C-alpha cells in the first residue's frame, strides 16, 4: 500500500529558498536568524546529529523568507552528511539565493561521544552598520 506523504513531508520535499527584494537596499543593516532544531545524520554511524544554526547577514539585493529557510534546513533531516559539508553547503545555497554583502553561518552541534563541534563559515566582507 502506498501511503500519501503527510503535508509537512510534502512541504519539506518541495522546499526552496524563497527571497524578496531588500526593502532598504541603500542602508547597511544586519539580519540574525537562529534555527535551534537542525538535524542531519552522521555519514559514518547513521546516528542523528543535532545543531543550532545561527546566521547573521547583511542583505544585498534579496532577503530570505523565514518560512522558506525553515523548510529548507528541515530537508537535511534524513541526509547523511558531515558537519563541515552541511554547514558549507547551506551557506553556499543561501549566498546563491540572496547575494548578500556579508554572511556568516555557525552550526553549533550538540556534543556526542564527549566531542562538541562548532563549524563557522562566512562569505563577503562585513560592513559597519
UniProtKB/Swiss-Prot annotation:
Disulfide bonds: none annotated. Substrate binds at residues 64-66, 83-84. Its EC number is 1.7.1.13. One of its GO terms (cellular component) is cytoplasm. Its main location: cytoplasm. Keywords: Cytoplasm, NADP, Oxidoreductase, Queuosine biosynthesis. It comes from the Bacteria. The active site is at 42 (thioimide intermediate), 49 (proton donor). It catalyses: 7-aminomethyl-7-carbaguanine + 2 NADP(+) = 7-cyano-7-deazaguanine + 2 NADPH + 3 H(+). It is an enzyme of class 1 (oxidoreductase). It is found in: Cytoplasm. GO terms for molecular function: preQ1 synthase activity. Pathway: tRNA modification; tRNA-queuosine biosynthesis. Belongs to the GTP cyclohydrolase I family. QueF type 1 subfamily. This is NADPH-dependent 7-cyano-7-deazaguanine reductase. It comes from Synechococcus sp. (strain CC9605).
Amino acid at each position: 500500500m502506498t501511503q500519501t506523504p503527510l503535508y509537512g513531508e510534502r512541504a519539506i520535499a518541495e522546499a526552496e529558498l524563497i527571497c524578496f527584494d531588500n526593502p532598504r537596499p541603500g542602508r547597511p543593516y544586519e539580519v540574525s536568524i537562529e534555527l535551534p532544531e537542525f538535524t542531519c545524520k552522521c555519514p559514518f554511524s547513521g546516528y542523528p546529529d543535532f545543531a543550532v544554526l545561527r546566521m547573521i547577514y547583511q542583505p544585498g539585493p534579496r532577503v530570505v523568507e523565514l518560512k522558506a529557510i525553515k523548510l529548507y534546513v528541515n530537508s537535511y533531516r534524513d541526509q547523511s552528511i558531515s558537519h563541515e559539508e552541511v554547514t558549507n553547503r547551506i551557506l553556499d545555497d543561501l549566498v546563491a539565493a540572496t547575494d548578500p554583502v556579508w554572511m556568516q553561518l555557525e552550526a553549533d552541534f550538540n556534543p556526542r561521544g564527549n566531542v562538541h563541534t562548532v563549524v563557522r563559515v562566512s562569505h563577503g566582507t562585513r560592513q559597519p552598520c
